[in-house]
Curated annotation (Swiss-Prot):
SUPFAM superfamilies registered for this protein in UniProt: Ribosomal protein L16p/L10e
Recorded GO MF terms: rRNA binding; structural constituent of ribosome
Keyword check for Iron: no
Stored CDD domains: Ribosomal_L16_L10e (cd01433)
InterPro entries membership: Ribosomal_uL16 (IPR047873), Ribosomal_uL16_bact-type (IPR000114), Ribosomal_uL16_CS (IPR020798), Ribosomal_uL16_dom (IPR016180), Ribosomal_uL16_sf (IPR036920)
Gene3D superfamilies: Ribosomal protein L10e/L16
Species the sequence originates in: Oryza sativa subsp. japonica (Rice)
Pfam family, one: Ribosomal_L16
Organism ancestry: Eukaryota, Viridiplantae, Streptophyta, Embryophyta, Tracheophyta
Keyword Ribonucleoprotein among record annotations: yes
Gene behind the chain: RPL16
Protein name: Large ribosomal subunit protein uL16m
Sorted UniProt keywords: Mitochondrion, Ribonucleoprotein, Ribosomal protein
Amino acid sequence: MEKHLVMYLTRKSIMLLRKYPLVTEFQVSKCGSHIVKIRRDVLYPKRTKYSKYSKCRCSRGCEPDGTQLGFGRYGTKSCRAGRLSYRAIEAARRATIGQFHRAMSGQFRRNCKIWVRVLADLPITGKPAEVRMGRGKGNPTGWIARVSTGQIPFEMDGVSLSNARQAARLAAHKPCSSTKFVQWS
């Protein structure tokens, strides 16, 4: 991860990080939790209690935790419940950073902060192509994060309103769920 990027986690993410033992490659300064940085800066647990979990449907309701801006002045809010893959989270983060680099250059390194408030902690399994049915569940292929309606996956601060709006618009194309731009008032 870049040196200028500061990453803080929500209470739910900290609870998940305490639940799953993780390897240290760098530390998050605010909460002091250890997280993994593997596969192009993607964060996910090193090991979980079970290697495979049931699919479970995403609840359509709104959870109170994570629905308000907690760290930054601007953010993106999910309009409906869904699942975010670890690749979509990383792609949205990189799109946001890229927009700030284009618009602000050196000022971004000094002032801007981005918070990723979701952690891909659930493994997804899949079977290879052209394999017959049966013989158990497939091997883990990736990680997802469940996002409820109204949850804020990304926050940013230290940028102008127009730059934040543009970055949120670019980042909204990456995840599969629809999002909207929110501003602290």
